[in-house]
Protein backbone atom coordinates (compact mmCIF):
# COMPACT_ATOMS: atom_id res chain seq x y z
CA UNK A 1 0.00 0.00 0.00
CA UNK A 2 1.47 3.42 -0.93
CA UNK A 3 1.93 5.68 2.09
CA UNK A 4 -0.94 8.06 2.71
CA UNK A 5 -0.10 11.74 2.90
CA UNK A 6 -2.71 14.42 3.46
CA UNK A 7 0.08 16.95 3.09
CA UNK A 8 0.96 15.56 -0.34
CA UNK A 9 -2.69 15.77 -1.39
CA UNK A 10 -2.82 19.39 -0.24
CA UNK A 11 0.42 20.09 -2.09
CA UNK A 12 -1.11 18.87 -5.36
CA UNK A 13 -3.95 21.33 -4.98
CA UNK A 14 -1.44 24.06 -4.14
CA UNK A 15 0.43 23.31 -7.38
CA UNK A 16 -2.82 23.62 -9.30
CA UNK A 17 -3.51 26.97 -7.67
CA UNK A 18 -0.02 28.22 -8.54
CA UNK A 19 -0.58 27.37 -12.20
CA UNK A 20 -3.26 30.02 -12.46
CA UNK A 21 -0.54 32.66 -12.83
CA UNK A 22 0.86 30.88 -15.89
CA UNK A 23 -2.34 29.84 -17.59
CA UNK A 24 -4.38 32.91 -16.99
CA UNK A 25 -6.58 32.60 -13.96
CA UNK A 26 -8.82 30.24 -12.06
CA UNK A 27 -10.69 28.94 -15.10
CA UNK A 28 -7.90 26.54 -16.09
CA UNK A 29 -7.68 25.11 -12.61
CA UNK A 30 -11.43 24.74 -12.32
CA UNK A 31 -11.52 23.01 -15.69
CA UNK A 32 -8.84 20.52 -14.57
CA UNK A 33 -10.56 19.83 -11.28
CA UNK A 34 -13.95 19.40 -12.92
CA UNK A 35 -12.48 17.10 -15.55
CA UNK A 36 -10.91 14.91 -12.88
CA UNK A 37 -14.19 14.96 -10.95
CA UNK A 38 -16.10 13.78 -14.02
CA UNK A 39 -13.59 11.01 -14.68
CA UNK A 40 -13.77 9.76 -11.10
CA UNK A 41 -17.56 9.96 -11.06
CA UNK A 42 -17.79 8.05 -14.33
CA UNK A 43 -15.46 5.32 -13.04
CA UNK A 44 -17.51 4.91 -9.86
CA UNK A 45 -20.76 4.77 -11.85
CA UNK A 46 -19.31 2.12 -14.20
CA UNK A 47 -18.15 -0.10 -11.37
CA UNK A 48 -21.09 0.48 -9.00
CA UNK A 49 -23.03 -2.72 -8.36
CA UNK A 50 -26.58 -1.45 -7.93
CA UNK A 51 -28.43 -3.05 -5.02
CA UNK A 52 -32.13 -3.56 -5.57
CA UNK A 53 -32.49 -5.63 -2.42
CA UNK A 54 -30.30 -6.47 0.55
CA UNK A 55 -26.55 -5.97 0.40
CA UNK A 56 -26.20 -9.69 1.12
CA UNK A 57 -27.89 -10.45 -2.21
CA UNK A 58 -24.66 -9.46 -4.01
CA UNK A 59 -23.06 -12.85 -4.64
CA UNK A 60 -19.58 -11.46 -5.45
CA UNK A 61 -19.51 -9.44 -2.25
CA UNK A 62 -20.63 -12.46 -0.24
CA UNK A 63 -17.94 -14.58 -1.91
CA UNK A 64 -15.33 -12.05 -0.76
CA UNK A 65 -16.64 -11.95 2.81
CA UNK A 66 -17.43 -15.65 3.02
CA UNK A 67 -13.90 -16.63 2.09
CA UNK A 68 -12.36 -14.64 4.95
CA UNK A 69 -11.56 -15.77 8.47
CA UNK A 70 -12.34 -12.25 9.69
CA UNK A 71 -15.26 -10.52 7.95
CA UNK A 72 -15.04 -6.91 9.17
CA UNK A 73 -18.41 -5.19 8.73
CA UNK A 74 -18.21 -1.45 9.30
CA UNK A 75 -20.60 1.46 9.64
CA UNK A 76 -20.38 5.19 8.97
CA UNK A 77 -22.30 6.01 12.14
CA UNK A 78 -23.31 4.35 15.40
CA UNK A 79 -26.94 5.35 14.92
CA UNK A 80 -28.12 4.39 11.41
CA UNK A 81 -30.68 1.59 11.15
CA UNK A 82 -29.64 0.39 7.70
CA UNK A 83 -26.05 -0.27 8.72
CA UNK A 84 -27.19 -2.58 11.55
CA UNK A 85 -29.78 -4.37 9.43
CA UNK A 86 -27.50 -4.89 6.44
CA UNK A 87 -24.73 -6.22 8.71
CA UNK A 88 -27.25 -8.56 10.31
CA UNK A 89 -28.41 -9.90 6.94
CA UNK A 90 -24.82 -10.37 5.76
CA UNK A 91 -23.93 -12.12 9.01
CA UNK A 92 -26.88 -14.50 8.75
CA UNK A 93 -25.64 -15.64 5.35
CA UNK A 94 -22.08 -15.92 6.65
CA UNK A 95 -23.34 -18.15 9.47
CA UNK A 96 -25.67 -20.32 7.40
CA UNK A 97 -23.65 -20.63 4.19
CA UNK A 98 -20.02 -20.02 5.14
CA UNK A 99 -19.67 -21.45 8.64
CA UNK A 100 -19.10 -18.27 10.65
CA UNK A 101 -19.06 -19.28 14.33
CA UNK A 102 -18.84 -15.96 16.19
CA UNK A 103 -20.11 -12.40 16.04
CA UNK A 104 -17.71 -9.96 17.73
CA UNK A 105 -19.00 -6.43 18.30
CA UNK A 106 -17.67 -3.06 19.43
CA UNK A 107 -18.90 -3.57 22.99
CA UNK A 108 -17.51 -4.74 26.33
CA UNK A 109 -16.98 -8.41 27.11
CA UNK A 110 -19.21 -8.69 30.23
CA UNK A 111 -22.13 -6.86 28.57
CA UNK A 112 -21.99 -9.05 25.47
CA UNK A 113 -21.70 -12.21 27.60
CA UNK A 114 -25.36 -11.93 28.63
CA UNK A 115 -26.33 -11.92 24.97
CA UNK A 116 -23.99 -14.84 24.29
CA UNK A 117 -25.65 -16.90 27.02
CA UNK A 118 -29.09 -16.04 25.68
CA UNK A 119 -28.38 -16.92 22.04
CA UNK A 120 -26.84 -20.23 23.16
CA UNK A 121 -29.99 -21.11 25.12
CA UNK A 122 -28.25 -21.05 28.51
CA UNK A 123 -30.09 -20.18 31.74
CA UNK A 124 -30.59 -16.49 32.46
CA UNK A 125 -32.56 -13.92 30.53
CA UNK A 126 -36.04 -14.75 29.31
CA UNK A 127 -35.86 -12.80 26.04
CA UNK A 128 -33.54 -10.78 23.86
CA UNK A 129 -34.59 -7.46 25.36
CA UNK A 130 -33.55 -8.66 28.80
CA UNK A 131 -30.28 -10.04 27.45
CA UNK A 132 -29.47 -6.66 25.87
CA UNK A 133 -30.13 -4.84 29.14
CA UNK A 134 -26.49 -5.44 30.08
CA UNK A 135 -25.69 -2.50 27.81
CA UNK A 136 -26.33 0.19 30.42
CA UNK A 137 -23.69 2.76 29.57
CA UNK A 138 -24.10 5.69 27.24
CA UNK A 139 -24.93 5.26 24.39
CA UNK A 140 -27.56 2.62 25.12
CA UNK A 141 -29.04 2.87 21.62
CA UNK A 142 -25.81 1.58 20.08
CA UNK A 143 -26.72 -2.03 20.96
CA UNK A 144 -30.16 -1.67 22.52
CA UNK A 145 -32.04 -1.08 19.29
CA UNK A 146 -34.66 -2.99 17.31
CA UNK A 147 -32.27 -4.14 14.57
CA UNK A 148 -29.89 -5.76 17.07
CA UNK A 149 -32.79 -7.26 19.02
CA UNK A 150 -34.18 -8.90 15.89
CA UNK A 151 -30.76 -10.34 15.03
CA UNK A 152 -30.29 -11.66 18.58
CA UNK A 153 -33.66 -13.42 18.46
CA UNK A 154 -32.81 -14.88 15.04
CA UNK A 155 -29.47 -16.15 16.33
CA UNK A 156 -31.10 -17.84 19.31
CA UNK A 157 -33.55 -19.57 16.97
CA UNK A 158 -30.75 -20.63 14.64
CA UNK A 159 -28.69 -22.02 17.51
CA UNK A 160 -31.61 -23.96 18.94
CA UNK A 161 -31.35 -26.44 16.07
CA UNK A 162 -27.62 -27.03 16.63
CA UNK A 163 -25.68 -29.14 19.15
CA UNK A 164 -24.29 -26.94 21.97
CA UNK A 165 -20.70 -27.20 20.71
CA UNK A 166 -21.70 -25.83 17.29
CA UNK A 167 -23.73 -22.85 18.43
CA UNK A 168 -22.68 -19.40 17.25
CA UNK A 169 -21.45 -17.01 19.94
CA UNK A 170 -21.79 -13.26 20.52
CA UNK A 171 -18.78 -11.46 22.01
CA UNK A 172 -17.58 -7.96 22.93
CA UNK A 173 -14.11 -6.71 21.97
CA UNK A 174 -13.92 -3.28 23.67
CA UNK A 175 -12.19 -2.39 26.94
CA UNK A 176 -14.26 0.03 29.01
CA UNK A 177 -15.67 -2.37 31.62
CA UNK A 178 -12.80 -2.18 34.13
CA UNK A 179 -14.84 -2.73 37.29
CA UNK A 180 -17.40 -5.09 35.73
CA UNK A 181 -14.54 -7.27 34.53
CA UNK A 182 -12.86 -7.21 37.96
CA UNK A 183 -16.13 -8.38 39.49
CA UNK A 184 -16.44 -11.14 36.88
CA UNK A 185 -12.91 -12.43 37.56
CA UNK A 186 -13.51 -12.50 41.31
CA UNK A 187 -16.89 -14.21 40.96
CA UNK A 188 -15.37 -16.93 38.81
CA UNK A 189 -12.42 -17.53 41.15
CA UNK A 190 -14.66 -17.52 44.24
CA UNK A 191 -16.51 -20.41 42.66
CA UNK A 192 -13.62 -22.37 41.13
CA UNK A 193 -10.46 -21.52 43.11
CA UNK A 194 -10.91 -19.66 46.45
CA UNK A 195 -7.15 -19.33 47.17
CA UNK A 196 -6.70 -17.72 43.74
CA UNK A 197 -9.65 -15.44 44.49
CA UNK A 198 -7.90 -14.27 47.66
CA UNK A 199 -4.78 -13.40 45.64
CA UNK A 200 -6.84 -11.60 43.02
CA UNK A 201 -8.63 -9.49 45.65
CA UNK A 202 -5.31 -8.38 47.09
CA UNK A 203 -4.12 -7.32 43.64
CA UNK A 204 -7.32 -5.60 42.57
CA UNK A 205 -7.56 -3.77 45.92
CA UNK A 206 -5.22 -1.25 44.30
CA UNK A 207 -8.32 0.22 42.59
CA UNK A 208 -10.50 0.48 45.70
CA UNK A 209 -10.09 4.20 46.30
CA UNK A 210 -11.16 4.87 42.70
CA UNK A 211 -14.13 2.53 42.60
CA UNK A 212 -16.48 5.38 41.75
CA UNK A 213 -14.27 7.07 39.16
CA UNK A 214 -11.84 5.17 36.95
CA UNK A 215 -10.97 8.36 35.11
CA UNK A 216 -9.75 9.80 38.42
CA UNK A 217 -7.46 6.76 38.67
CA UNK A 218 -6.08 7.53 35.23
CA UNK A 219 -5.55 11.20 36.05
CA UNK A 220 -3.89 10.55 39.42
CA UNK A 221 -1.51 7.92 38.09
CA UNK A 222 -0.73 9.77 34.88
CA UNK A 223 0.42 12.87 36.76
CA UNK A 224 2.24 11.09 39.58
CA UNK A 225 -0.27 11.75 42.35
CA UNK A 226 -0.76 8.04 43.05
CA UNK A 227 1.07 4.78 42.24
CA UNK A 228 -0.44 2.79 39.41
CA UNK A 229 -1.84 -0.74 39.46
CA UNK A 230 -0.02 -2.03 36.38
CA UNK A 231 2.11 -4.64 38.13
CA UNK A 232 -0.90 -5.96 40.04
CA UNK A 233 -3.15 -6.45 37.00
CA UNK A 234 -0.34 -7.98 34.91
CA UNK A 235 0.48 -10.39 37.74
CA UNK A 236 -3.16 -11.40 37.98
CA UNK A 237 -3.42 -12.09 34.26
CA UNK A 238 -0.22 -14.13 34.32
CA UNK A 239 -1.49 -16.07 37.31
CA UNK A 240 -4.66 -17.04 35.48
CA UNK A 241 -2.93 -17.91 32.21
CA UNK A 242 -0.34 -20.06 33.97
CA UNK A 243 -2.85 -22.42 35.56
CA UNK A 244 -3.13 -24.79 32.61
CA UNK A 245 -3.72 -27.74 34.92
CA UNK A 246 -6.89 -26.06 36.11
CA UNK A 247 -7.81 -25.44 32.48
CA UNK A 248 -7.40 -29.13 31.64
CA UNK A 249 -9.62 -30.13 34.55
CA UNK A 250 -12.29 -27.67 33.43
CA UNK A 251 -12.15 -28.96 29.88
CA UNK A 252 -12.67 -32.47 31.20
CA UNK A 253 -15.97 -31.46 32.75
CA UNK A 254 -17.02 -29.09 29.96
CA UNK A 255 -16.32 -25.74 31.67
CA UNK A 256 -13.52 -24.47 29.41
CA UNK A 257 -15.73 -21.62 28.19
CA UNK A 258 -16.16 -20.29 31.74
CA UNK A 259 -12.40 -20.30 32.22
CA UNK A 260 -11.90 -18.50 28.90
CA UNK A 261 -14.43 -15.81 29.86
CA UNK A 262 -12.59 -15.25 33.15
CA UNK A 263 -9.22 -15.03 31.41
CA UNK A 264 -10.62 -12.57 28.89
CA UNK A 265 -11.98 -10.39 31.69
CA UNK A 266 -8.51 -10.42 33.25
CA UNK A 267 -7.05 -9.34 29.90
CA UNK A 268 -9.59 -6.56 29.74
CA UNK A 269 -8.66 -5.33 33.24
CA UNK A 270 -5.01 -5.25 32.16
CA UNK A 271 -5.85 -3.27 29.00
CA UNK A 272 -8.32 -0.94 30.72
CA UNK A 273 -5.78 -0.05 33.41
CA UNK A 274 -3.31 0.97 30.70
CA UNK A 275 -6.02 2.81 28.80
CA UNK A 276 -7.07 4.97 31.74
CA UNK A 277 -3.45 5.90 32.41
CA UNK A 278 -2.93 6.72 28.74
CA UNK A 279 -6.13 8.62 28.00
CA UNK A 280 -4.79 11.83 29.55
CA UNK A 281 -1.66 11.68 27.42
CA UNK A 282 -3.29 12.21 24.02
CA UNK A 283 -5.74 10.66 21.58
CA UNK A 284 -3.29 8.66 19.47
CA UNK A 285 -1.82 6.57 22.29
CA UNK A 286 -5.21 5.76 23.83
CA UNK A 287 -6.76 4.97 20.44
CA UNK A 288 -3.91 2.62 19.55
CA UNK A 289 -4.14 0.85 22.89
CA UNK A 290 -7.88 0.37 22.45
CA UNK A 291 -7.64 -1.07 18.95
CA UNK A 292 -4.70 -3.27 19.95
CA UNK A 293 -6.90 -4.70 22.71
CA UNK A 294 -9.66 -5.36 20.19
CA UNK A 295 -7.26 -7.32 17.99
CA UNK A 296 -5.82 -9.20 20.97
CA UNK A 297 -9.38 -10.17 21.91
CA UNK A 298 -10.14 -11.36 18.38
CA UNK A 299 -6.94 -13.42 18.30
CA UNK A 300 -7.72 -14.96 21.70
CA UNK A 301 -11.25 -15.73 20.54
CA UNK A 302 -9.94 -17.26 17.32
CA UNK A 303 -7.59 -19.51 19.30
CA UNK A 304 -10.29 -20.51 21.80
CA UNK A 305 -12.85 -21.35 19.13
CA UNK A 306 -10.27 -23.14 17.00
CA UNK A 307 -9.21 -25.67 19.63
CA UNK A 308 -12.18 -27.92 18.87
CA UNK A 309 -12.22 -27.36 15.08
CA UNK A 310 -10.11 -28.73 12.25
CA UNK A 311 -10.31 -25.47 10.27
CA UNK A 312 -9.71 -21.90 11.39
CA UNK A 313 -12.93 -20.42 12.81
CA UNK A 314 -14.64 -17.63 10.89
CA UNK A 315 -15.60 -14.49 12.82
CA UNK A 316 -17.87 -11.59 11.79
CA UNK A 317 -16.87 -8.28 13.38
CA UNK A 318 -19.26 -5.33 13.79
CA UNK A 319 -17.64 -1.97 14.49
CA UNK A 320 -17.27 1.55 13.12
CA UNK A 321 -15.46 2.20 9.83
CA UNK A 322 -12.84 4.10 11.81
CA UNK A 323 -11.85 0.84 13.51
CA UNK A 324 -12.28 -1.57 10.62
CA UNK A 325 -10.98 0.39 7.63
CA UNK A 326 -7.19 0.27 7.22
CA UNK A 327 -5.84 3.35 9.03
CA UNK A 328 -2.84 3.52 6.69
CA UNK A 329 -5.19 4.78 3.96
CA UNK A 330 -6.31 7.79 6.02
CA UNK A 331 -4.77 10.95 7.39
CA UNK A 332 -5.33 9.47 10.87
CA UNK A 333 -2.72 6.87 10.03
CA UNK A 334 -0.35 9.64 9.03
CA UNK A 335 -0.76 11.02 12.56
CA UNK A 336 0.37 7.71 14.05
CA UNK A 337 -2.93 5.89 14.60
CA UNK A 338 -3.41 2.25 13.78
CA UNK A 339 -6.60 0.24 13.99
CA UNK A 340 -8.21 -3.18 13.83
CA UNK A 341 -8.40 -3.29 10.05
CA UNK A 342 -4.73 -2.44 9.62
CA UNK A 343 -3.51 -4.88 12.28
CA UNK A 344 -5.58 -7.79 10.97
CA UNK A 345 -4.44 -7.12 7.41
CA UNK A 346 -0.84 -7.06 8.57
CA UNK A 347 -1.31 -10.30 10.51
CA UNK A 348 -3.66 -12.23 8.22
CA UNK A 349 -3.52 -10.66 4.75
CA UNK A 350 -6.54 -11.47 2.60
CA UNK A 351 -7.94 -13.71 5.34
CA UNK A 352 -9.32 -10.41 6.66
CA UNK A 353 -12.00 -8.84 4.43
CA UNK A 354 -12.82 -5.20 5.18
CA UNK A 355 -16.29 -3.86 4.27
CA UNK A 356 -17.05 -0.17 4.75
CA UNK A 357 -20.37 1.66 4.62
CA UNK A 358 -21.19 5.23 3.58
CA UNK A 359 -24.28 7.44 3.46
CA UNK A 360 -25.03 10.89 2.08
CA UNK A 361 -28.06 12.11 4.00
CA UNK A 362 -31.02 11.11 6.15
CA UNK A 363 -31.36 10.89 9.93
CA UNK A 364 -29.24 9.46 12.72
CA UNK A 365 -29.59 8.66 16.42
CA UNK A 366 -26.88 10.58 18.25
CA UNK A 367 -26.24 12.96 21.13
CA UNK A 368 -24.86 16.50 21.09
CA UNK A 369 -22.56 15.94 24.08
CA UNK A 370 -21.21 13.08 26.20
CA UNK A 371 -23.96 11.55 28.31
CA UNK A 372 -26.45 13.79 26.54
CA UNK A 373 -29.95 12.62 25.68
CA UNK A 374 -30.63 10.70 22.50
CA UNK A 375 -31.65 12.95 19.63
CA UNK A 376 -32.84 12.09 16.14
CA UNK A 377 -30.78 14.41 13.99
CA UNK A 378 -30.83 15.26 10.31
CA UNK A 379 -27.70 14.03 8.53
CA UNK A 380 -26.42 16.81 6.31
CA UNK A 381 -25.69 15.99 2.65
CA UNK A 382 -22.03 15.16 2.08
CA UNK A 383 -19.69 18.13 1.79
CA UNK A 384 -18.40 19.16 -1.62
CA UNK A 385 -15.17 17.29 -2.25
CA UNK A 386 -16.20 14.32 -0.11
CA UNK A 387 -16.64 10.70 -1.10
CA UNK A 388 -20.22 10.90 0.16
CA UNK A 389 -21.03 13.75 -2.25
CA UNK A 390 -19.33 11.93 -5.12
CA UNK A 391 -21.27 8.74 -4.46
CA UNK A 392 -24.52 10.73 -4.25
CA UNK A 393 -23.78 12.31 -7.63
CA UNK A 394 -23.80 8.89 -9.31
CA UNK A 395 -27.58 8.99 -8.97
CA UNK A 396 -27.54 5.36 -7.77
CA UNK A 397 -29.38 5.09 -4.47
CA UNK A 398 -27.75 1.88 -3.21
CA UNK A 399 -24.61 0.28 -4.58
CA UNK A 400 -21.52 -1.73 -3.73
CA UNK A 401 -17.96 -1.26 -4.97
CA UNK A 402 -15.59 -4.23 -5.01
CA UNK A 403 -12.23 -2.59 -4.38
CA UNK A 404 -9.78 -5.46 -3.93
CA UNK A 405 -7.81 -5.79 -7.18
CA UNK A 406 -10.12 -3.29 -8.89
CA UNK A 407 -7.68 -1.99 -11.54
CA UNK A 408 -9.27 0.96 -13.32
CA UNK A 409 -11.38 1.82 -10.31
CA UNK A 410 -8.36 1.83 -8.02
CA UNK A 411 -6.60 4.25 -10.35
CA UNK A 412 -9.64 6.53 -10.49
CA UNK A 413 -9.98 6.57 -6.70
CA UNK A 414 -6.29 7.12 -5.95
CA UNK A 415 -6.65 10.78 -4.92
CA UNK A 416 -7.66 11.24 -1.25
CA UNK A 417 -10.98 12.94 -0.51
CA UNK A 418 -12.91 13.84 2.58
CA UNK A 419 -14.68 10.97 4.34
CA UNK A 420 -17.32 11.36 7.05
CA UNK A 421 -17.42 9.51 10.37
CA UNK A 422 -20.34 9.98 12.77
CA UNK A 423 -19.91 8.32 16.14
CA UNK A 424 -22.32 8.64 19.06
CA UNK A 425 -21.93 12.42 18.93
CA UNK A 426 -23.11 14.35 15.87
CA UNK A 427 -22.46 18.07 15.57
CA UNK A 428 -23.62 19.25 12.15
CA UNK A 429 -22.83 22.84 13.13
CA UNK A 430 -19.13 21.92 13.02
CA UNK A 431 -19.48 19.20 10.38
CA UNK A 432 -16.12 19.63 8.64
CA UNK A 433 -14.01 19.90 11.80
CA UNK A 434 -15.89 17.28 13.82
CA UNK A 435 -16.65 14.54 11.34
CA UNK A 436 -14.39 14.56 8.27
CA UNK A 437 -10.88 13.37 7.49
CA UNK A 438 -9.00 12.57 4.28
CA UNK A 439 -9.10 8.96 3.08
CA UNK A 440 -8.53 6.65 0.12
CA UNK A 441 -11.25 3.99 0.38
CA UNK A 442 -9.71 1.87 -2.37
CA UNK A 443 -6.86 1.04 0.05
CA UNK A 444 -8.96 1.44 3.18
CA UNK A 445 -11.49 -1.30 2.37
CA UNK A 446 -11.85 -4.41 0.24
CA UNK A 447 -15.42 -3.39 -0.58
CA UNK A 448 -17.61 -0.38 0.13
CA UNK A 449 -21.39 -0.06 0.26
CA UNK A 450 -23.05 3.31 -0.27
CA UNK A 451 -26.63 3.75 0.97
CA UNK A 452 -27.55 7.24 -0.18
CA UNK A 453 -30.29 7.85 2.39
CA UNK A 454 -30.41 6.24 5.83
CA UNK A 455 -32.60 6.62 8.90
CA UNK A 456 -32.00 6.58 12.63
CA UNK A 457 -32.01 3.35 14.62
CA UNK A 458 -35.07 2.63 16.74
CA UNK A 459 -33.91 2.46 20.39
CA UNK A 460 -35.48 -0.05 22.74
CA UNK A 461 -35.59 2.60 25.44
CA UNK A 462 -34.35 6.09 26.24
CA UNK A 463 -30.68 6.97 26.62
CA UNK A 464 -29.23 6.51 30.09
CA UNK A 465 -26.01 7.86 31.64
CA UNK A 466 -23.15 5.42 32.05
CA UNK A 467 -22.64 3.83 35.47
CA UNK A 468 -20.35 5.62 37.92
CA UNK A 469 -16.66 4.94 37.48
CA UNK A 470 -16.76 3.89 33.82
CA UNK A 471 -16.63 6.22 30.83
CA UNK A 472 -18.96 6.02 27.83
CA UNK A 473 -18.27 3.11 25.53
CA UNK A 474 -16.84 5.32 22.81
CA UNK A 475 -14.80 7.86 24.79
CA UNK A 476 -12.92 9.87 23.57
CA UNK A 477 -13.60 9.77 19.83
CA UNK A 478 -17.27 8.92 19.49
CA UNK A 479 -16.34 5.90 17.39
What are these regions (language model features)?
Residues 19-479:
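Structured catalytic-domain cores with a bias toward divalent-metal coordination
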Residues 5-19:
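Low-acidity, Ser/Thr- and Arg-rich intrinsically disordered low-complexity segments
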